[in-house]
Design a protein with these regions (language model features):
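Alpha-helical transmembrane-bundle signature of multi-pass membrane transport and export proteins
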Residues: 1-250
Length: 250
């Protein structure tokens, strides 16, 4: 969010210099931290540890579906990589407008996170997650067809809001369902998929925009997200009643 506003009001050069200065400051502060010692624990090979994480995930139902749903929605539904094209060629709002577009999803996510502290989506968590991802796809389609800045900002803010709901539910599921000795392994597997899907999603968006155009590429991404939600809805109806608050108490 701050990056978008910095780009809008300070320009590209000042924003990049500010980021470099802040990163350098973080590096210095980390090096000033005192060293800590930890008790020795039995270590495993990385591949062996990841393999155990994959095996545990395969034994459950809600965990692999949660990871897969997020993976596909980010891989196909993300539009962040295409925002410069929309700002320049479609909305014609220039660098300042691009900053607003970049900030909109973060603003939507921030407002939603604050609301979730009062109204957590824990009852019928899986159904809520599917609805949130479906909303992400629908608002992606709305952004693709928007010719107005205010409507584009609203659509992007709502994608951030829906994504934040999905993230909260998914992260809670990944913390509650694995036993204590498997949480790190499951988190590592999830982190591997999340980090790779973000980069591959940007590549997919750029490749699709090159051959289909930015609007059709965004429509394709939103449609694929809705298709995955429909498939998940049909295959996981038995999970609709899941209450992750009760699972946490157990």
């Amino acid at each position: 969010m701050l990056g978008g506003f910095m780009l809008a009001f300070l320009g590209r050069e000042t924003s990049l210099i500010s980021v470099a200065v802040l990163l350098s400051l973080c590096f210095l502060l980390v090096n000033l931290l005192s060293k800590r010692t930890f008790p020795k624990i039995e270590t495993e090979r990385v591949l062996q540890s990841l393999g155990e994480g994959f095996r545990f995930i395969a034994k459950t139902k809600i965990v692999p579906w949660a990871i897969s749903l997020d993976l596909v929605s980010v891989l196909f539904g993300g539009v962040i990589a295409l925002l410069p094209i929309f700002a320049e060629d479609i909305l014609k709002i220039g660098p300042e407008g691009l900053g607003y577009l970049r900030a909109a999803p973060s603003i939507g996510a921030l407002i939603t996170m604050i609301a979730l502290t009062r109204f957590p989506p824990t009852r019928h968590a899986w159904r809520n997650m599917l609805l949130a991802v479906a909303g992400f796809g629908l608002f992606t389609l709305l952004f693709a067809y928007s010719d107005y800045l205010w409507l584009s900002l609203f659509a992007l803010a709502m994608t951030g809001a829906c994504d934040s709901i999905s993230v909260v539910i998914r992260q809670t599921i990944l913390q509650i369902y694995p036993p204590e000795n498997m949480r790190g392994r499951v988190a590592a597997v999830n982190g591997m998929f999340v980090s790779s899907s973000n980069e591959l999603g940007a590549f997919e968006s750029g490749l699709a925009a090159k051959y289909l155009g930015p609007v059709i590429a965004t429509v394709f991404g939103g449609s694929m997200t809705l298709l995955v939600v429909a498939l998940s809805w049909a295959k996981t109806k038995d999970l609709f009643g899941v209450d992750i608050t009760q699972a946490e108490q157990k």
